[in-house]
Amino acid sequence: MSKRLTKAEKAAQAEAAMIAAQNAELAAQADEALNADEAQAVEALAVETEANEAQADEAQPVVLSAEELRAKAEAAQTLLLESVQVRIDNAPSANFAKNMLAELNALSGRNALIAIEKCVELEVDFESLATAYAIADDKAHDYVAIYAAQKIRKSLFALATGMTSVFDGYTRSIMQNLVSLHSLSNRGSQRALSRAIVFDEAMQTEAVRAYKDCAPSTASTQASSTRQAMRFLNVCNVAKSKKDDAMTFTESKAAQKLQAMFNA
């Protein structure tokens, strides 16, 4: 009798191992579009959220209940995914479609939902963001280019987890300077990414530090997409002027959170 029981136990263990391996494979596929810091941060965020949900019944009343907050996050996630799918369906090239599909996968599932929920609390306007995502005309003012889409997604996870390492390196360098200087011109944003960009005497007013060092052409593209991403997330305002654009922080909770992250 004991011999048959041992075989049954072994069979059960083998089945459990197989299920665990399958689950691990699915988890790896879901995290494929995330970098290592992003995946680690999201995993910690999921654990924290589960603990908070377990204590929800004992928590003090809030303006928005946990159920209402989750419902808003689910609606926001649905809007985002629908808009990204529009871009995939209208992709100008196979490579663009591939990149947007990676964004679709990264914004899907429970981990992304948790990050979106955190950003709903930070006053990110997901309806406006989804509307912009759906624009397929690359000449439109609110068109979201692929670099900006990637930065928006990374920034959502960074704000949700409170980890500056989750921002892409270009955005991180620009934000480090903006937090220090409180206002940053377009030229200053590029200087934060490339030491090859030199100010003329009239523009030598910003003590900008280049935490990244790339080609000037790359700096221009990356600075532009970072400004766009921060504007869509209601983190920064961009004031236009004849001399140069200037980026400043908004009064939103997302902007306050970002500044606190870089000042920590």
What is each stretch, according to the model?
Residues 250-264:
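Short, amphipathic alpha-helical interaction segments positioned at domain boundaries
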Residues 214-232:
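Short amphipathic alpha-helical interaction segments
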Residues 196-220:
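Short helix-coil junctions and helix-kink-helix linkers
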Residues 240-246:
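Short, Lys/Arg-rich nucleic-acid/phosphate-binding segment
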Residues 7-64:
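N-terminal intrinsically disordered, low-complexity tails
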Residues 179-189, 193-195:
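Short, amphipathic alpha-helical interface elements at domain boundaries
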Residues 69-183:
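Long, low-complexity, charged/polar intrinsically disordered regions in eukaryotic proteins
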